[in-house]
Amino acid sequence: MTSIDHALLEGYLVRTRWFGGKGRPFRVTGVRELAELPGDGHGPDVGVYLVTVEYQDAEDGTELYQVPLARYEEIEDRHGHAYVGSVQVDGHERHLYDAVHDRDAMALWLRGFIAAEASGRTDVGGLRFRRVSAGPALDPDLRSSPLTGEQSNSSLRFDDTAIMKLFRKVSPGVNPDIEIHDVLTGAGSEHIAELYGWIETDIDGEVLQLAMLQEFLSTAADGFELATGSVRAALVDPELTVIESGGDFGGEAARLGEALAEVHAALRERFPSERRGQEATTRLARAMAERLDRALPVVPEIEPYAARLRALYDAVAQLDGLEVQRVHGDLHLGQTLRTAHGWRIVDFEGEPGRPFAERAMLDSPWRDVAGMLRSFTYAPGLVEMSLVGRPGEDHQQELRGERAKEWSAIAREHFLHAYTAALEPAGAGSRAGGGAGADAAQNADPVAGADAPAELSPPLRTLVDAYEADKAVYEAIYEKRNRPSWVAIPLVALERIAAG
């Protein structure tokens, strides 16, 4: 077992992309070796460590991070960018590197998955490798490459066969990302990346899930990047309408709405669902109002809309109930991928920072819908903001603003039409928070344009507006603290919602 100095890890954590405590005073208070994967004699062995971080500010709190380290007897210059530090082991110096950036280290994890193919499970060095029966046989010669862009976790691909997400901030218990992907893979869902397996261990009598292996989608494009590209095309010549410019995203939005409806239907069939009474809508409205109260000191610009938002939340409290089920929980365009075979929805971890038990709670599927509607406003808002300030373009800027709103309206309406239309065959009623039936979506033509708004029943319209407002309040707090120049995007949404 390798003993690692806490100060060494503190210096390492602040250099990583995925550490959530950058900018906060913290210290490492514990390091626990969870597992040790033996090498083959030519490469490294790998130690998997659980690092306890305690914060020393007004919020306090403790977090657990997974840190797998490749351990070498000699300095490996080829991995200099992933160097963590050196330690003494039995009088000998060992050099530590972030294992995610080391192909030889990740090959040990790949071997674990291969060994589990026959029985669905194998134990290696303290880690339990699990395989899904439908997964493909894996080639031991697959080469790993870390992916860029991941923030809270680390992802790497094994050539064009599989992608592994390594959870960095971990908690004991079943991770919803693994749980939901396992169920939807078993159901044959076409709108997710198929789950191939996962890695877990036990800690203090509870399961601790560390990584998941999935289908690699070789033709995938990020949904948010696709949307912003569409917006840019629409704003190249703002004298043209969105349809005339070729920047219309309505068809893609409709297909995404259908995909989400099918995922929600599969979750409703395979997990518990129920109807809750008015106490649920009262509790929901209270939570929304409390978030608004917390937001006002941080974002005082919300104040002009606060009274109207409170009235909207009061209307939610008066709804007669809520249909709840398992949902995505943190859905936006960045959690979607467009492939040659359609849309895939990814990252079912839920809202970061919440305990697993809370993320697995039943919720209204309309929360996911509202999250996507917000994303169809964020994409044009971000692009429009990037074009502000060009001298002598006041008229052009005004036109761009109109085209951005037009793009958003088309995408939102197509998405909502398609979502509600796809739910109709399920026969769900139009009660607040439930699946939308014929009376919930009275105009559910998935190819209708922005001039034919989706006519949700009044209770559903109230609920969706409230969820969207609550999401925008959350965004306003985040942007004010992290990207102040972006706070105008959620504020515009709050102005629109407050205006009714």
Predicted regions located by residue number:
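Active-site catalytic-loop/activation-segment of kinase and kinase-like phosphoryl-transfer enzymes
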Residues: 263, 276-313, 406-423, 477
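Intrinsically disordered, low-complexity terminal tails and inter-domain linkers enriched
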Residues: 41-42, 122, 140, 395-400, ...
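An alpha-helical support segment within catalytic cores of ATP-dependent transferases
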Residues: 129-142, 291-326
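Conserved catalytic-loop position in the HRD/HxD motif
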Residues: 330
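Activation of the activation-loop gatekeeper triad in protein kinase-fold domains
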Residues: 347-351
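ATP/Mg2+ or Mg2+-diphosphate-binding catalytic cores
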Residues: 390, 402-432, 438, 446, ...
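Conserved ATP-binding subdomain of kinase catalytic cores across diverse folds
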Residues: 48, 55-288, 341-342, 353-401, ...
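Conserved protein kinase catalytic/activation segment
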Residues: 335-345
